[in-house]
Amino acid sequence: MKEPSYLIRKKVYDALDGNITLNSATLSVYNVVPSSGSYPYIYIYSISNDNTESNKSKYISSITTRIEVITAFDTNTGGQLDCILAMNQITQLLVSQSSYFDLSSDNFNVYGARNNGITYITEDTDTQTLYRAILSFESTVEQTS
């Protein structure tokens, strides 16, 4: 069995990079958030690869990738709206009933792209309030060879 998680994460990155805006500014997209990163931004990381079915001729996996939108405001200011607006753009680009990532050149067939839930979190620090929208994005992937 081959591991396609990194291929899905790359496709997610490519789909979002340069395409999500808030207040006329394009959000940065990261796989690793640099110390120089500034809010708001999008953070993408892999969660799991669950082998859902296998037989003598193929493996089918459920790949879970998390996509987070993180915004920050001075303590007791701001709100979740920017996270919700950015997440709305993200789900429109990623979640589909009929068109999925093309991984055929890597010997995979993607035939599912689902929103497995969006979680909204508010975190207070000494100086800021962070608002996070976290999408659990599931792709169903078949290894073709």
Describe each model-derived feature in a short phrase.
Residues 39-48:
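A short, hydrophobic beta-strand-centered structural micro-motif
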Residues 1-32, 47-145:
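Charged, amphipathic alpha-helical segments and their flanking helix caps
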Residues 35-36:
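Short, charge-patterned binding micro-sites
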